[in-house]
Design a protein with these regions (language model features):
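The catalytic Tyr-centered alpha-helix of NAD(P)H-dependent dehydrogenases
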Residues: 139, 143-150, 173, 179, ...
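Hydrophobic alpha-helix immediately C-terminal to the catalytic Tyr-X-X-X-Lys motif of short-chain
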Residues: 153, 157-161, 190, 251, ...
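N-terminal Rossmann-like NAD(P)+-binding domain of SDR-like oxidoreductases, especially those catalyzing
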Residues: 1-174
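Conserved hydrophobic/aromatic "anchor" residues
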Residues: 12, 123, 174-177, 213-215, ...
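Residue-level recognition of beta-strand->loop/alpha-helix junctions
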Residues: 172-175, 267-269
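Conserved active-site region of classical short-chain dehydrogenase/reductase
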Residues: 103-111, 184, 217-220, 224
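C-terminal substrate-binding subdomain of Rossmann-fold SDR/epimerase-dehydratase oxidoreductases
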Residues: 17, 195-310
Length: 310
């Protein structure tokens, strides 16, 4: 039976990936440090279902210090999702967390995977690496936030380890939403601001910022395909996006339609490091992974809302 490692297994995307692979018959070892950056009990709830499965085991460990080598020797595929997320939290002293978790932690995983003879490492990069050049065929990696810099550095590390023979696949996720989304992320905040209570959505700018929102199940589908369907070795980095770019104002209108309520808003200036628009180029993902997003924004928001209001 195929065995795989998932770092960040109790997180938003990692818990969905764990469930997907278990349902397909894989044996999974999940790694998570339950960082109190947000409430650990949320992650504990995320991972409840996998923990009940006979083919799942969980190691509570930190990627900055855990000895991966012996574990990796027993597994053929690694899905590396563990990271310190968040553009705004990466400014100032917060960048140290980005460096330690995203860059150093990733380098340790690549190093161990190389020496353990792992077949492939598929890892989560981000649309943040594009910065303001996030559209058009000539766009370049040009991050405008410390978080984006940390993710771009991970991709550069991937190039270095590819030269040494490690098969690595970076996936540039575009604005992921859906059930179990982190509490600091926009969709959760929008629904909180529409449902009864006192929470108000912190709207930065006028809502004209456009994002390519991607439903978590589509993200997981692409991730599994990158891990197992893609021919080896891979020399690609793939944009993984939902197919349609929508403005925040348009999303707010959809949330109000779904909840039949008005969103409470406090308005602030545009945040540093926040690009005006992100648009994915998914042609390579379609060609080499056989992947495309299947969830419309309307349907994805409905599923997000139903899980949020449970």
């Amino acid at each position: 039976m195929t065995r795989a490692i998932i770092t960040g297994a109790a997180g938003f995307i990692g818990s969905h990936l764990s469930e997907k692979l278990l349902a397909e018959g894989y044996t999974i070892v999940g790694i998570d440090n339950f960082d109190p950056w947000y409430e650990p009990k949320i992650k504990q709830q995320n991972i409840e279902s996998p923990l009940k499965h006979k083919n799942f085991s969980l190691i509570e460990a930190d990627i900055r210090s855990f000895d991966f080598l012996s574990l990796f020797k027993k597994n053929d595929t690694v899905f590396h999702l563990a990271a310190r997320p968040g553009v705004q939290d990466s400014w100032g002293q917060g960048f140290l967390n980005s460096v330690e978790n995203n860059i150093y932690g990733t380098q340790r995983i690549f190093e161990a995977a190389l020496h353990a003879g792992v077949r492939r490492v598929t890892f989560a990069s981000s649309s943040s690496i594009y910065g303001s050049s996030a559209t058009g065929p000539e766009r370049k990696v040009n991050p405008i936030s410390p978080y984006g810099v940390s993710k771009a550095a991970c991709e550069q590390l991937a190039e270095v380890y590819r030269e040494r023979g490690l098969d690595l696949v970076p996936l540039r996720y575009f604005t992921v939403y859906g059930p179990r989304q982190r509490p600091d992320m926009a969709m959760n905040r929008l629904f909180r601001a529409a449902l009864p209570g006192s929470f108000r959505f912190p709207l930065r700018g006028n809502g004209n910022q456009r994002r390519e929102f991607t439903f978590v199940e589509d993200i997981v589908d692409a991730t599994v395909r990158a891990g197992y369907t893609l021919k080896s070795p891979s020399l690609e980095a793939f944009d993984i996006g939902g197919g349609v770019s929508a403005s925040l104002a348009e999303v707010m209108a959809l949330v109000e339609q779904i909840t039949e309520a008005s969103i409470r808003v406090d308005q602030y200036p545009v945040a540093d490091g926040d690009p005006l628009i992100t648009v994915a180029s998914t042609e390579q993902a379609s060609k080499l992974l056989g992947w495309k997003a299947n969830t419309s924004l309307q349907d994805g928001l409905q599923q997000h809302y139903e899980s949020f209001s449970e």
